[in-house]
Amino acid sequence: GVLGGAGLPDALDAALDAARALRGQGWELLPVMSFAAGQDTRFGRGTGWRQQLEGLTGHPVLDTLQAVEPLGPRRLADALVIAPCTGATLARLAEGLSDTPVTLAAKSLLRVGSPIVVAVSTNDGLGASGENIARLYQRKHYYFVPYGQDDPNTKPQSLKARFELLPQTLEAALEGRQLQPVLQCPCG
């Protein structure tokens, strides 16, 4: 499998925990980072996320368009897990854009019919990003980690995947089915 991601630290930490669970089940993971995930922010340094991913997976991070393009055609991965998947990445996927390592990895794997597992983490999931989520549901080979509102009282538009369900979602996606129920009670 391939693990790609971009997002805020709480979601990145949850994604790393899910990746550890996948590794514990024997999955080999190839890490892919978006350009944005490699940036330093007030939440942490991009090099820190890179080092954690490389240490966890035992592989260098794929962070260029050239590095991810052959993933599908050369059958280097069975699936792509985008964890976390931000509103910006949802928009790019919905528009069919392949201008980041994560979105080009998705295009590369879709070319050969491989599943794309999306772990949503966005503050506007019930706002502007809601339309993009709906568009991806209508396409073949996209599967969602079950999700819910992560803080309905303070951030009523915000959605976050139940990252602990990522391994089961990946297994279901490889069988061609969506893990249900996809809409969950609020995630805390």
Predicted regions and their residues:
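A cross-family phosphate/adenosyl-ligand binding-site feature
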Residues: G1-I116, S121-G188
